[in-house]
Amino acid sequence: MSVEVANETEWQLDPKVFSELGLWVMHQMRVSTQSELTITFVDPEPIAELHERWMDLQGPTDVMSFPMDELRPGDERNEPEGMLGDIVICPWVAQQQAQAAGHSTMEEMMLLTIHGVLHLLGYDHHTREQERQMFGLQRQLLLTFFALHHGTAWSATLPSGSVNELEVYERKYGTNRELGH
C-alpha cells in the first residue's frame, strides 16, 4: 500500500500523519497491499472548481473523492488490488466545520480523510441508513486510530500573517455554497 500526500496550501501540516492514517484505514478495510491512494490539500478556489465540475454544486466543499478502480472492502480471503483513488481536502472549509463542531482543524481533516477513503470504497450517505452506517464506521475508525496513538499531539496551523483563503473566495464569489460531502 502506498499513500502520497500533497499540500498545495499555506497550512503547515505533517503529511506523514495523513499517510499513516490512510494506510491504517486501508489496512482496517482490508484493501490490498498493492493499492495506492493520493491525498491532496487545496485552497477553496481549486476545490470549488472541482465541486462545480463533478458535482454541479457551487462553492468550496470540505472533501471530494475520486475513485479509480472502484475497489470495495475486502475480507480474510480477498483483498482487491488496484488504485484506490484520490482524495481532495480543503483545510479552510475543514477549519470552519471544526469550529462549528467544537474540535480541532486537524481532527476534522483526519475525519475527512477517513470519510474520503470510505467513499472510495463505495460507502455513501444518500439515505439515513447509509449515513448511519458510514458515519458510525468513520467515527469508530477515527476513535480507534486516536486510541492507538494516545498522547500524540497533531496540529495543522497557518503561518503568521496568512490570508484567510476562504474569506478571499467568499469576497470574490459570495457565500452561496453548499457544505458537506
Curated annotation (Swiss-Prot):
Uppermost EC category: hydrolase
Chain residues that bind Zn(2+): 115, 119, 125
Cell location: Cytoplasm
Recorded GO CC terms: cytoplasm
Listed GO biological process terms: rRNA processing
Family in the record: Belongs to the endoribonuclease YbeY family.
The organism's place on the tree of life at top rank: Bacteria
InterPro entries given in the database record: MetalPrtase_cat_dom_sf_prd, YbeY, YbeY_CS
Keywords, comma-separated and alphabetical: Cytoplasm, Endonuclease, Hydrolase, Metal-binding, Nuclease, Ribosome biogenesis, rRNA processing, Zinc
Needed co-factor(s): Zn(2+)
EC code: 3.1.-.-
UniProt keyword Cytoplasm present: yes
One matching Pfam family: YbeY
GO molecular function, one term: metalloendopeptidase activity
Native organism: Bifidobacterium animalis subsp. lactis (strain AD011)
Protein name (record): Endoribonuclease YbeY
